[in-house]
Amino acid sequence: MELKQVIIAHKAGHNESKTYAERCARELEARGCKVLMGPSGIKDNPYPVFLASATEKIDLALVLGGDGTTLAAARHLSPEGIPILSVNVGGHLGFLTEPFDVFQDTQKVWDRLNQDRYAVSQRMMLAASLFEGDRRDPQMVGETYYCLNEMCIKPASIDRMPTAIIEVEVDGELIDQYQCDGLLVATPTGSTCYTSSANGPILHPGMDAIVITPICPLSLSSRPIVIPPGSSVNIWPLGDFELNTKLWTDGSLATGVWPGQRVGVWMAHRAAQFILLRESYSFYKTLRDKLQWAGARFLYDGNNKVN
């Protein structure tokens, strides 16, 4: 990878993340690389400016923060095919980030990138849009939204906690009509997030699939379902007379859903590309460490338990 132009996003409001971002910018500029840098957070979205200001192809996005900062980068940069190196600086769980200890010697990191001494993890993304009109000839309304974890169709109100009636169709066939708090349509990457909390299955991120999970359904027979990645999911919010239904992408508000509109969800045409610096990466070890599964309490040397 030749680093001619790099964007650096640091966690908004986190001093250590900003300090490391400035240090990385100086080092890359000393190597003749053009750098665009800015904060990323709830009130800060630097990516439209990054993409509009780039004078040439963006070779790398360096993200210094946690999983939330990484999700924002994936939503905006993956459709452009920009690889992401995400490092846990100020994050919490760090499911999607490289550990900070592999980023201590940053000069060595730049050398490794220039010498192509890294791996790339491809993570499936989802796309969603609003549609209205006839089922056989639907018209897209507004823009297309992307997510790395999940699309969530859920009502929101200032003064109460409304439930939803949601009808779901897959590839033109009715699946179920849920009365629930909301509905999740997730990727394998997102299966360890909101979907897992809603009693959905955990899927390996190396596979492509879509998980549909109702949130707190009133019927005990309403269960999560895993469908092929090429499936088209259509979601109709019903009986929303107070106009509360919203589409959320990775926990961020995307748009409101009006009566007569449906949400279409499908696999995005491009996957998120994450740079891996660790020489050994195990998804199962990540589950043990981050979710504190029982296996994390014991150390093994080969087949023998150490303690």
From Swiss-Prot:
Needed co-factor(s): a divalent metal cation
GO molecular function: ATP binding; metal ion binding; NAD binding; NAD+ kinase activity
Catalytic activity annotation: NAD(+) + ATP = ADP + NADP(+) + H(+)
Mutant phenotype after disruption: Insertion mutant shows a strong decrease in NADK activity compared to the wild-type. Under photoheterotrophic conditions, mutant shows a greatly reduced growth rate. Under photoautotrophic conditions, the growth curves of the wild-type parent and the mutant do not show any differences, and mutant shows a metabolic pattern similar to that of wild-type. Deficient mutant accumulates glycogen under photoheterotrophic conditions.
InterPro entries given in the database record: ATP-NAD_kinase_N, ATP-NAD_kinase_PpnK-typ_C, NAD/diacylglycerol_kinase_sf, NADK
EC number(s) given by UniProt: 2.7.1.23
Catalytic-site annotation from UniProt: 67
Keywords, sorted A to Z: ATP-binding, Cytoplasm, Kinase, NAD, NADP, Nucleotide-binding, Transferase
HAMAP family according to UniProt: NAD_kinase
Function: Involved in the regulation of the intracellular balance of NAD and NADP, and is a key enzyme in the biosynthesis of NADP. Catalyzes specifically the phosphorylation on 2'-hydroxyl of the adenosine moiety of NAD to yield NADP. Essential for photoheterotrophic growth. Has a significant function in the oxidative pentose phosphate (OPP) pathway for glucose catabolism under photoheterotrophic conditions. Is also involved in cellular redox homeostasis.
Name by which UniProt lists this protein: NAD kinase 1
Species the sequence originates in: Synechocystis sp. (strain ATCC 27184 / PCC 6803 / Kazusa)
